[in-house]
Amino acid sequence: MEQNSVLLDTSFFIRLLNEEDPLHENALGYFRYFLEHDFVIKISTIAIAEYCVRGDVSELPLKNMLIVPFNFDHAQRAGKMIAEVYAEKKKRGATIAPRAVVPNDTKMFAQADVEPDINFYGTADVECKKVYDMIKTSEGKLSFDFIDITVPYNNVFGVLDFEE
């Protein structure tokens, strides 16, 4: 049986590590589920950099995760992905500046798509779902599924959540 692997973004860790956040319980539920079901949990160097803007790297549960450095293959894939997004936005009437910038969520999507073992991408950023959907529509499919943690893990994975 193939082992599941998930790449988690910055917004996931912000929710996981802030007990006051409205999505903290959802993030905690997912993290527990991933650990209990032997998921390989991954974090991008991009997410680490974003987290360190307001947090400290020592706060991240790195001992439970593998770090995915952003590399040459990821960069090429990210450029192709954002070109597709810009083309779709242009079709919808948006004006695109001549100098393209690749947003960090698209870079992490590229990592999830290029790395052969990653089959899930977890985030609390519902806006990046629009980008994911545009890329998926343009290409027909991506190699990973999108997990929106505003939806509890038991709904996504179809399990009963028994209180302990």
Say what each PLM segment does.
Residues 1-3, 115-164:
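Acidic, PIN/NYN-like endoribonuclease modules and their adjacent C-terminal/linker elements
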Residues 60-69, 137-141:
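Active-site regions of enzymes building and remodeling cell-envelope glycoconjugates
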Residues 1-42, 52-65, 150, 154-164:
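Short, well-structured N-terminal submotif of metal-dependent ribonuclease cores
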Residues 10, 45, 101-109, 125:
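Conserved glycosyltransferase catalytic-site signature
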Residues 13, 48, 75, 128-129:
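A generic structural signal for short hydrophobic patches within well-formed alpha-helices
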